[in-house]
Amino acid sequence: MSHEGEEDLLEYSDNEQEIQVDNKETAVEGTTENEATQENGEADKKGSYVGIHSTGFKDFLLKPELSRAIIDCGFEHPSEVQQHTIPQSIHGTDVLCQAKSGLGKTAVFVLSTLQQLDPVPGEVSVVVICNARELAYQIRNEYLRFSKYMPDVRTAVFYGGTPIAKDAELLKNKDTAPHIVVATPGRLKALVRDKMIDLSHVKNFVIDECDKVLEELDMRRDVQEIFRATPRDKQVMMFSATLSQEIRPICRRFLQNPLEIFVDDEAKLTLHGLQQYYIKLEEREKNRKLAQLLDDLEFNQVIIFVKSTSRANELTKLLNASNFPAITVHGHMKQEERIARYKAFKDFEKRICVSTDVFGRGIDIERINLAINYDLLNEADQYLHRVGRAGRFGTKGLAISFVSNKEDEEVLSKIQERFDVKIAEFPEEGIDPSTYLNN
């Protein structure tokens, strides 16, 4: 990774707590800040809640309004990452968290920030930055879902491709100004630069998919400019499904004495209940094989990944002509259209979605239980984000990758090595639906 531009990153302490989580045990490394403050004779609440673990959401002692919303969502027991993170994050501890897709990382920062929020008219208290517009839209919806019994809390989403004047109008009116801002870096930087938004009261600063946001130099510089517009005394939380050793030091420069949690370090791909297969075939055989799979397999919703916008459009036309009603989403369509199609798919208006990698990160649609790599991607890391659309939140799911050339074979080999997983060839006789469908 290039180190260009790192010299102006904010320098904070490199001391951190690190928790390595797997299915059997939790190991805590390093000195907690509790111990450090005892030595220094100081009292600092950040990092002082190590070892608090809860088995039910009620044990977190959240606001009654949040507890009611959680019950309405049907949640009772926190996931592994929620269990280890929420008890400290609700008390203001900085967090660096890597956990595989589908373990509820979004709920960690949504619940934690809502728990701490004391809304003041006209003041932005929470900033959430993510790399994709669809993801920003989805995070906003999670805030709406969990704040349903907090009528005074307002949330807004800002991203490029829409008139900035509308954003400015919303922000300058105290009756409409949000307390929680979810945004992509470019648009939020523009609002800060033009003094359309005041971030001097921010108490919580969150970056979702932090590796993607910070590994691109331009996006990282946008984040730095936004970060400098916020108070130094605030909570910073960062989350991602993949967090390489190279990007972690970059993340840490934004953090103070963070709690670090890595669930399945190096993102070893053990997505709960997800069956993974590949199919070797010629390029010209892909359409016929895809139609056969859609006929033979049982699924609630399926997402099919392709490598380009033109292929997404052509494949969608072919599927619709073949009596497989499908919707397509890609980065070259207008933002309003992308959001509308995402919502239509999420609302189950269509069961088949053909997409480029615009849907490959963070997008959460619970009914998806089949992911097909029509075109295998070029890099191993993105595999986790693609197939992670299926089998989320511990449910079963199925991922199938088409392998049509030597380059695909090399990528498949890298995926298996990178994630320490064995991907089997799809059996000619098919597979038992009970292996990838919930009862």
Curated annotation (Swiss-Prot):
Ranges where the Helicase C-terminal domain occurs: 273-434
Annotated Gene3D superfamilies: P-loop containing nucleotide triphosphate hydrolases (3.40.50.300)
Domain Helicase ATP-binding: 86-261
Major subcellular site: nucleus
Residue numbers covered by motif Q motif: 55-83
Keywords: ATP-binding, Helicase, Hydrolase, mRNA processing, mRNA splicing, mRNA transport, Nucleotide-binding, Nucleus, RNA-binding, Spliceosome, Transport
Ranges that cross the membrane: none
Residue interval(s) of motif DECD box: 208-211
Entry similarity comment: Belongs to the DEAD box helicase family. DECD subfamily.
Protein name: ATP-dependent RNA helicase SUB2
Species annotation: Candida glabrata (strain ATCC 2001 / BCRC 20586 / JCM 3761 / NBRC 0622 / NRRL Y-65 / CBS 138)
Lineage start: Eukaryota, Fungi, Dikarya, Ascomycota, Saccharomycotina
